[in-house]
């Protein structure tokens, strides 16, 4: 999943935010 960060940074960030929202909510 490391190379995905360089290939699709926006997608990775969106996934991170999504997971964060699930953890908080």
Swiss-Prot record:
GO terms for biological process: proteolysis. Placenta. Glycosylated. It comes from the Eukaryota. The keyword Protease applies. Its EC number is 3.4.23.-. Keywords: Aspartyl protease, Glycoprotein, Hydrolase, Protease. It is an enzyme of class 3 (hydrolase). GO terms for molecular function: aspartic-type endopeptidase activity. The keyword Zinc does not apply. Belongs to the peptidase A1 family. This is Pregnancy-associated glycoprotein 67. It comes from Bos indicus (Zebu). The lineage of its organism: Eukaryota, Metazoa, Chordata, Craniata, Vertebrata.
């Amino acid at each position: 999943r490391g190379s995905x960060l360089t290939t699709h940074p926006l997608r990775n960030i969106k996934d991170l935010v999504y997971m964060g929202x699930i953890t908080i909510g």
